[in-house]
């Protein structure tokens, strides 16, 4: 490769990435997922588009796809709170194993019939498109405030279901390549256990060693993110090399690092955010370049039928069966989880496997997978806001600062700076600072008014559009949010929870005269205990029950237990 070729590569890459970044603004205006924008830019630059770039190197696509996916999962793991496992771990694992197997089987049967393939070839297509995609799920759910049970289940499922899909894909490729007639089920189960066991063991063990290394090393601040990424990729590669699931390993590594005290945590997350965006852009650009629209047209109708079968039948059946043991999921939550079975880069990367193995019909497998992913992202991704409202799984977004950054003062305490802009309707407007009920251990360190820095004192009265800088901890965010945060554009709070918030510790017998309730059967219970009896354990914000003409909704949680309960009349529409 000469200097001119290298420079041309830099020029084209910079143009494509820059165009993807600038065009990403169209996502919100057109109501389509941002990943579709990146994919479309790649297709337009490809051989059938105005760019005319001929790219058919599947090994490079495999390299870029795996590298990008590893970084995305590392970032996703670091942003997942382990507290969400309280409500979502076992349901997500059920969907990641049983759910993927059922989706593969049902989709494979349809693929064999639609494309006139034998059963094993159809099952290979089912395995390729059988898993949800972490990049798509993290990207599309990141900006939405869904109830914790639903969002955590979808995120953990997408981060842990790839081992099953990879295992099924590799196994079926081996069967087709060697013309095997029978299956050694014991061997297959052993291999599946190896994938999950090594992935989980090395991911957690390697993550713990990486955590100790990061906290003990004395480096320039900018080097800690590089150490984190390189360590995560090392764990990913080592796990894959010995037959485990590198994808699961790096997700668990990120999960462990994100839930422990980590040196330069804020800087690392900031760098990872940029790398994740670059990974998504690069991965979908390459996959878009790899696709040839003229090759998709001949299989468009059967591929569309397969996508519809998977979205409307295979995925819902797998979700309903996978979640059968878990009674906490309401039918509307099951329906939403069924609908958000987003396919993304993983199926396309898995479709590269048959190409590299030289299987017959390999191009067909790739084209079908690409078409299914495109339909999934456009149809399911674009309808996500509407689906969340119809399923009533969207809850009012918790108040949050307009900016936050870490203070590397004490590794164990994890101090942060939170920036708040005061809106006119906040109750603290006009109040002196001495009257604010600040959370213990927090301090207002700066106040900006009309672009000027003021020295705040106890007698300073707050005004609309003041900007406050507060030092505190992550655990202080709920209380600070109630004091200072900008109200959302559409305040769902009163309409969703009701005008009255009651203490979960309130006795039912005390509430009876206020609301005209017959509490003879629950007179000895608190309101929180009553809801737990009605809805089961592991409650989340947004859980609700209709009882005696009123709707009772969990409004706040504290340490896994309800703290505040909203109450409203049934005729009030929360949406």
Curated annotation (Swiss-Prot):
MF term (GO), any: potassium:proton antiporter activity
Alphabetized UniProt keyword annotations: Antiport, Cell inner membrane, Cell membrane, Ion transport, Membrane, Potassium, Potassium transport, Transmembrane, Transmembrane helix, Transport
Its membrane topology: Multi-pass membrane protein
Keyword Protein transport among UniProt keywords: no
Gene Ontology biological process terms in this record: cell volume homeostasis
Keyword set includes Nucleotide-binding: no
SUPFAM superfamilies: FAD-binding/transporter-associated domain-like, TrkA C-terminal domain-like
RCK C-terminal domain location: 404-486
Domain of life assignment: Bacteria
Family of this protein: Belongs to the monovalent cation:proton antiporter 1 (CPA1) transporter (TC 2.A.36) family. NhaP2 subfamily.
This protein's name: K(+)/H(+) antiporter NhaP2
Organism: Aeromonas salmonicida (strain A449)
